[in-house]
């Protein structure tokens, strides 16, 4: 089961009061519902491929409304052969939709979120929960970039969803996609906050565990990469210095160098894998600082470069 499926399964098990259930079911119906007319009667179908969501929707609708609710199962023949679950309301469909402010008395559709249904904090959380159940997805934090999104068919609803999420300081954004609009979160911390807000506490804990491990792994990798780069730089410098010293030795002999340079040159050739600090501690006349050793080695590099250019070097 994917992380998104586990999250939705957890959300379908949350207990809520009637006000919160109404907010949740309004999101599910608004986003997954469709209307049809047959025999002069309006029929509402709410469709999902998730059995747990269908059961929850059916249970809530039966609890909140006196109308007959049918739960139908259809086989999806094309592509994925998942079952399709349909909650259907015939008699009372219009009254139910008016109560949820999805349509008005004169049958005008309202594509935004009814403020009446989200007066309190718990109702706002419930609406977001319903919206995620209806059209949400979240990437597996172990294998992908952090991303949570909720798909809306209408721009007004996508933007209303973004505004509602941002009441919880989630930094949500909305973008137009093919056949609709997506309200999304990209920051790991905000995704974790969203999971907590809608009540997916187990999913949030799993997400946080993975996030912490990933962040630690990334930090370790950065440190290792940095240390490797520094080590490669040090090794590269040492090899260049040894090459220059040997060039000088073959060209004019190390005896032509001043005594301080001659000693550091011989030490560098003999101890190629030690640091400049360690090299400075080997000087016979007394410890030379790291910067002092570096200065002498730079002088040796300059002499080697001068010899390559054919210049004469005095003793």
From Swiss-Prot:
DNA-binding interval(s): 275-309
The entry's keywords: Cell cycle, Cell division, DNA-binding
Pfam families linked to this entry: HTH_WhiA, LAGLIDADG_WhiA, WhiA_N
Range of residues in the leader sequence: none
Protein's GO biological process: cell division; regulation of sporulation
GO terms of molecular function: DNA binding
Family, as annotated: Belongs to the WhiA family.
NCBIfam families given in the database record: DNA_bind_WhiA
Stated role: Involved in cell division and chromosome segregation.
PANTHER family tied to this protein: CELL DIVISION PROTEIN WHIA-RELATED
Record protein name field: Probable cell division protein WhiA
Species of the source: Lysinibacillus sphaericus (strain C3-41)
